[in-house]
A protein has these predicted regions:
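Charge-dense, helix-prone N-terminal extensions
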Residues: 1-113
């Protein structure tokens, strides 16, 4: 098990309005100016958009896999995942769900992935 940045790139490439940006040596995936996923510099952890009110429960349910973002990012709708703890199927689910949070509902509804 375990996924890479290249796995993520392949997943997000077909997502409408999605693009990659490098900010402070960190790869981020965006829709417009909104970041929906970001890889930490060492590429072992990925932060992704996730409903703020659900993140504590997610982290508590699988603490070896998910973790809360650093204190400076707690104000965002964000949670983190250890990349060595997931497979490509789960990565796809996390990325597509995060992307859906950031695009207009019509765009999300039109996506068949």
């Amino acid at each position: 098990m375990g996924v890479t940045l290249d796995d993520a790139r392949a997943i997000v490439a077909p997502l409408p309005r999605s693009y990659e940006a490098v900010v402070r040596d960190s790869v981020r995936f965006r829709v417009g100016r909104i970041v929906y996923a970001a890889f930490y510099e060492d590429e072992t952890v990925m932060g992704f958009a996730f409903p703020r009110e659900e993140r504590e429960a997610l982290v508590a349910s699988e603490p070896d896999k998910f973790l809360l973002p650093r204190a400076s990012d707690m104000r965002f709708r964000w949670v983190c995942v250890r990349l060595d703890a997931i497979d490509v199927v789960e990565l796809r689910e996390l990325l597509v769900d995060a992307w859906r949070m950031c695009v207009p509902k019509k765009v999300a509804a039109a996506y068949e992935g």
